[in-house]
Amino acid sequence: MTAILENLAAARRAGKPAGITSVCSAHPVVLRAAIRRAAASQTAVLIEATCNQVNHLGGYTGMTPRDFVAFVNSIAAEEGLPAELLIFGGDHLGPNPWRREKAEDALTKAAAMVDAYVTAGFRKIHLDASMGCAGEPAALDDVTIAHRAAKLTAVAEKAATEAGLPKPLYILGTEVPVPGGADHVLETVAPTEPQAARNTIDLHREIFAQHGLSDAFERVIAFVVQPGVEFGSDNVVAYDPQAAQSLSAVLDGEPRLVFEAHSTDYQTEPALAALVRDGYPILKVGPGLTFAYREALYALDMIASEMVGTYGDRPLARTMEKLMLSAPGDWQGHYHGDDITLRLQRHYSYSDRIRYYWTRPEALAAVSTLHKALDGKTIPETLLRQYLGELPLAAVAGKEPEEVLVAAVDQVLATYHAATGEGRH
């Protein structure tokens, strides 16, 4: 089912650009929404895990790549999506989780992670060795990055061969700023300089050849660049096609390649469609999906507070605030300002750092309490309009809480599918 990925460049050259949404989340409600949408049209869905989220040592989700595949497959089975329509991708695979260690140790762990991803059945592999490790500059030179990426590619190639699996498709390069959105207000973001993009492509082609990996380079389908889209804590930098025109033109000299756009969260449908048209057809989205989940969850928290006398006054939001204050590691350093500003960012930031807390026992218990409070109850249309007015009434009226949450995420996915043409390919 990777044909859709392999045909992206040809579709652009033929003047019929098509795209694909890259769902970058391990949240079960987000995954269910994406899989349910794919099942409705029986089309492929691309689901990606990041190096910090899922790795051979467990990552912050506690899942190895094989665990993640099994987890997603179980949801797909429940939703009636054949396993062959699932495309698994690994994002930013490299030394990042261990960058505070010496390069040799970090890269050894990165290699083990890549091996685990490939043998688990991940077909789309983004290799990112751009970050410095202990004693190195924060940003490495291009030659070092390319050599490290080539070494990780060799690991992936060997893993696929030994497991009897198809060879992976590769994504190379990285974007600036770091993955997951900026941690400050951005007014504009400059697209990658066209010559820098050309140099990155040419250098990787040359160094892969030096490593005897020219065949693998033929399976590089995209390079990650910055087309000028980003989101900060409370603002979004919209895509400007004119500003990215010269960067898009680089692809005219690389007929087998497209660009991959990260941090497309919160872009409008016209902006996403323009990205696909201009050569950035792989649209990665993550925080924007869990943001929609949190919006709907907090709306239900308000509704339960209004409807159920024994529920209390927004106990879910209060639990999350207490939890984030007691374990600030996942937001501190990313949010800035006075106490009120920090509180607002903890809950409502576009960066959505709250997403790291939903799997903690206290959060799971609070969400379960909310579900139990509303299960079997009919929410009046007037309350739905008051707190969930952004969602079509037909999508939420008479629905259980879980279905409301799925509908909220699906509304975001619908914007992406309208822009990419998914479901119509």
Swiss-Prot record:
InterPro entries: Aldolase_TIM, GatZ/KbaZ-like, GatZ_KbaZ_carbometab. Disulfide bonds: none annotated. Coiled coil: none annotated. One of its GO terms (biological process) is carbohydrate metabolic process. GO terms for cellular component: plasma membrane. It catalyses: keto-D-tagatose 6-phosphate = keto-D-fructose 6-phosphate. Pathway: Carbohydrate metabolism. Disruption phenotype: Deletion of the gene leads to slow-growth phenotypes for both D-galactitol and D-altritol. Pfam families: GatZ_KbaZ-like. Its EC number is 5.1.3.40. NCBIfam families: agaZ_gatZ. Involved in galactitol and D-altritol catabolism. Catalyzes the epimerization of D-tagatose 6-phosphate to D-fructose 6-phosphate. Belongs to the GatZ/KbaZ family. This is D-tagatose 6-phosphate 4-epimerase.
